[in-house]
Amino acid sequence: MNDLKLYNTLERKLSNFNPIDPKNIKIYACGPTVYDFIHIGNARPLVIFDVLVRVLRNLYPKVTYVRNITDVDDKINQRAKEKKISISELTNQTIKNFHDDCLSLGNLIPEHEPKATDHINEMIEMIEKLIYKGFAYISSNNVLFSIEKYKKYGELSGRSLDEMISGSRVDVADYKKNPGDFILWKPSSDDIPGWNSPWGRGRPGWHIECSAMSKKYLGDHFDIHAGGSDLIFPHHENEIAQSCCANNSNLMANYWIHNGYVTSNGEKMSKSLGNFTTINNLLLNSNGESIRYSLLQAHYRAPLSFGKKTINEANKSLSRLYRAVDGFKVDGEADQEILQNLSDDISTPKALARAHYLADQANKGSQECAQKLKNSSSILGILSNSTENWFKYGNSNLINKNVSSINDEEINKLILERKIAKENKDFLKADEIRDLLLKSNIILEDKPGITNWRKS
């Protein structure tokens, strides 16, 4: 077995991965706040951590992957007001758009995709524990976490409290005992979402959402917590504080993994700067696999400069790889050097370089190298289409909609997505997935606890 190494933000060094339970690796990744289409910067962690999960599944017998959806937030309230639609209409449509983008990018579906609004009781319970233990206090109908009570606060970001406050958008309100204290629960007016609680009608703060949901699905202490580097402070710092204090634990997660920014003209791509490009818009003239490849070309911790040329070059690279594996199907183990590269802190540039070496040898007649390349493609999440379809549709999003040659992995991904839709009572989406598979002559058979499929 290849030894997996990951850069741990908490320790500020590359560390060997030592799982809590090798029989079940547990990973939590911060998901989207659902008020708009995701942009290419949002897509980077989705793709990178998807590769990490694929590597983990290659190395270990079971991986429990949780990625949340934040569907209660002031940005959501404001956007619904601007569009003059209900909040549920906005969030349901945005979640559907998000799932469509993830499918186009070739991402696996997490085992659990909890929504914040379905876990309010768990959040209230955790807040009650923090108040009881003296880590939180009530002020002006708000519940706040007292950072002075947690002596390890600032350990993840490595900054002093003064630095963190001055360098962030922390709201310094007069009801706070300390400027760095953060909201666990806040009151809601009649025109915005709210839930009954011991502190009156209100809604949760952002940070408590992830603490409550990760605890429910992964427990007090799990292996990996992942997210963008912009989440280190305050989000992840605050998650650690409230989780450790509520759960009487020294660690929330053993490994904290963060990806770097995507830049446009040298600036971080973000919605606040308005210099972003949504995946939805990119798919009008490209395909998800080329976008995915683009996001794998730089090491995940380094900044990634993105532009139209980036996708064009990715498309050419994929064409070269598809040509090399023409006629081959996955049959056997992945190339050990590619797996070794990915096990070395998810070094996708090295893995892609190795893939192109194998393609060179395959194009010179080496069937062994062609087979190794095809066998390795699923770990990177590429080359899932037939070569014929790629060269027919690869320059457009039509390839994302062509299901005539759907493979087993794609079928299982769609079945899991349908399962999540049914759990979320989104029966319309569940029926759409069933109908999509039926067009490919795939018949689903639902049984208690499992869905089987067969070709008609």
Where are these regions (language model features)?
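N-terminal, positively charged, Ser/Thr/Ala/Gly-biased leader segments
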Residues: D100-A136
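Short Gly/Ser/Thr- and Asp/Glu-enriched loop/turn motifs at secondary-structure junctions
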Residues: I109, S139-S140, D446-I450
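Alpha-helical recognition segments enriched in aromatics with Gly/Pro capping
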Residues: M1-Y35, D50, N121-V330
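Short catalytic-loop micro-motif centered on adjacent basic/acidic residues
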Residues: P110-P114, H225-G227, N363-Q367
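Structural preference for alpha-helix termini/caps and helix-kink/transition segments
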Residues: K268-S456
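Acidic carboxylate-rich catalytic motifs and surrounding loops in phosphoryl-/glycosyl-chemistry enzymes
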Residues: R67, H112-D118, N142, N259
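N-terminal, positively charged nucleic-acid-binding surface of large information/translation enzymes
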Residues: E11-L14, I20-G106, L444-D446, W453
